[in-house]
Amino acid sequence: MDLWQLLLTLAVAGSSDAFSGSEATPAFLVRASQSLQILYPVLETNSSGNPKFTKCRSPELETFSCHWTDGANHSLQSPGSVQMFYIRRDIQEWKECPDYVSAGENSCYFNSSYTSVWTPYCIKLTSNGGIVDHKCFSVEDIVQPDPPVGLNWTLLNISLTEIHADILVKWEPPPNTDVKMGWIILEYELHYKELNETQWKMMDPLMVTSVPMYSLRLDKEYEVRVRTRQRNTEKYGKFSEVLLITFPQMNPSACEEDFQFPWFLIIIFGILGLAVTLYLLIFSKQQRIKMLILPPVPVPKIKGIDPDLLKEGKLEEVNTILAIHDNYKHEFYNDDSWVEFIELDIDDPDEKTEGSDTDRLLSNDHEKSLNIFGAKDDDSGRTSCYEPDILEADFHVSDMCDGTSEVAQPQRLKGEADISCLDQKNQNNSPSNDAAPASQQPSVILVEENKPRPLLIGGTESTHQAVHTQLSNPSSLANIDFYAQVSDITPAGNVVLSPGQKNKTGNPQCDTHPEVVTPCQANFIVDNAYFCEVDAKKYIALAPHVEAESHVEPSFNQEDIYITTESLTTTAGRSGTAEHVPSSEIPVPDYTSIHIVQSPQGLVLNATALPLPDKEFLSSCGYVSTDQLNKIMP
């Protein structure tokens, strides 16, 4: 037996290099355990009924104890039959357990004198001289602290509903651990549950000795326990005593179980019901919703016009309806310049012989008034409205009024002037000559009061007879301005006429001597011609020198012969002042714009303020008919 102990001692001494250093690793302990098993093969198996180690534990890293079980063999249960030996690096031999009593039955207690930290230990159990169990460890690996002590709790607050509460649980570390000095660092783990539950709820590990617990129900009781372990290890110590938490009795109505209303189900069913309602609403109002989302395209509709007329293409009827309104004019644009839309009636040559523009303007004939306002526009709009473009056929004789015609054909013009004077004498002697102008006189009523009044053109038969008598008197014509030219058309559609100047009363006569007759007199026999300004001046300047014994007014055989009123009045005024005394007759107000169209035969003219006597009325280039020229020329 002593030999075997010697061999074991040698083996431990030979492996002492594995325990060199300040600490031993588990690998070294495993190798030491394997060496012991080689030396003692009987330790490999623990025969049934033999004692064995259950655990070795150090509560504070200063002391430790080891425990084992009783063997089934009754011979091993007798006191002293089982012994425990230990060995460590600094001791070269096996030593028996120093204390079998302090740690309890079947245990061995090592106080601080026999405990070395970071030093590997190997222990063995022997019975009747034979080894029954063995184990190797290090003290820091078997640390299992004692449970915390002094658990208690503190109420933090209660919810406004008096249903939930918050508490703070506190405890103290194990009294035998030197936590304050930092010899050991502990981690705590708290478990809690309701009183009637079996499953504990665990909180995360903490390194403090207090932890708050939130939202605990006041009508419940809770159990709390705490355990601890050394930091960076996995083995916890025992749990502390269970702490029972009971809240003070509150208002019974507040402590009652709050009703768990099934909000989730209500929300689900509400959404489903809303979806079904929307589906039924859309299905029942499908057409109306379709019209709201996609409204139909409105049909073309003009107030006062039947849409069927537009569909059937009856544009003439539509234009007739639109013509009723003032802001609509057929085939005209209100925004365009009126100069570009001046119309001259030159399509029908037969109408040129029916009368002058003055006769057409003042005539009772409905067709002539319509032709004036609805004539075709052959003017390009580039020239002045006061210089109308007339066909060359209408001016084949009036062209002689220019300077070149006077130089090239003086003899021919002189002969034609003689013929003109003879024709005028014959016309003056004939009785029909006096009645013809009277029948062609337009019906004009001049109303003169203290304030301007409208001038009515085209009235009833009574007014026609009165005006006929007035216009037949040559003396009355001296104070009446004739409106023979449309000088402007306002954007509202009003026609602005250009008045002529008042002329001196007198009866011009044509002399039979051919040497005093100007070539321009021959132009009066031309149809649809205009008197040029140069020829008119020459004619009027030479007219006072004609002998007065004939007393025959110059006859203008054609109605549509015009001269410019500006040149006519200027020249006539100069010649009249040389031979006659200025007339003292009261001037008649000018009527230069159309006030309203009463009927196709009636126009109401607006009277304007009388011009100053000394101010010369400068009118645009106007045209005077032959009848007016015969009556107002000196």
UniProtKB/Swiss-Prot annotation:
Motif WSXWS motif, residue numbers: 236-240
Positions occupied by motif Box 1 motif: 293-301
Positions of disulphide bridges: C56-C66, C97-C108, C122-C136
Gene Ontology terms describing biological process: cytokine-mediated signaling pathway; endocytosis; growth hormone receptor signaling pathway; positive regulation of cell population proliferation; positive regulation of receptor signaling pathway via JAK-STAT
Transmembrane helix among keywords: yes
Location of the protein in the cell: Cell membrane
UniProt modified residues of type Phosphoserine: S337
Topology relative to the membrane: Single-pass type I membrane protein
InterPro entries membership: FN3_dom, FN3_sf, GHBP, Growth/epo_recpt_lig-bind, Ig-like_fold, Long_hematopoietin_rcpt_CS
Domain Fibronectin type-III as annotated: residue spans: 147-250
SUPFAM superfamilies linked to this entry: Fibronectin type III (SSF49265)
Region (Required for JAK2 binding): 290-375
Top-rank lineage group of the source organism: Eukaryota
Residue spans, topological domain Extracellular: 19-260
GO function terms (MF aspect): cytokine binding; growth hormone receptor activity; peptide hormone binding
Positions of glycan attachment: N46, N73, N111, N152, N157, N196
Leader sequence residues: 1-18
Motif residue range(s): UbE motif: 336-345
Transmembrane segments: 261-284
CDD domains: FN3
Subunit annotation: On growth hormone (GH) binding, forms homodimers and binds JAK2 via a box 1-containing domain.
Domain remark in the UniProt entry: The WSXWS motif appears to be necessary for proper protein folding and thereby efficient intracellular transport and cell-surface receptor binding.
Protein name, per record: Growth hormone receptor
Organism: Bos taurus (Bovine)
Lineage of source species: Eukaryota, Metazoa, Chordata, Craniata, Vertebrata
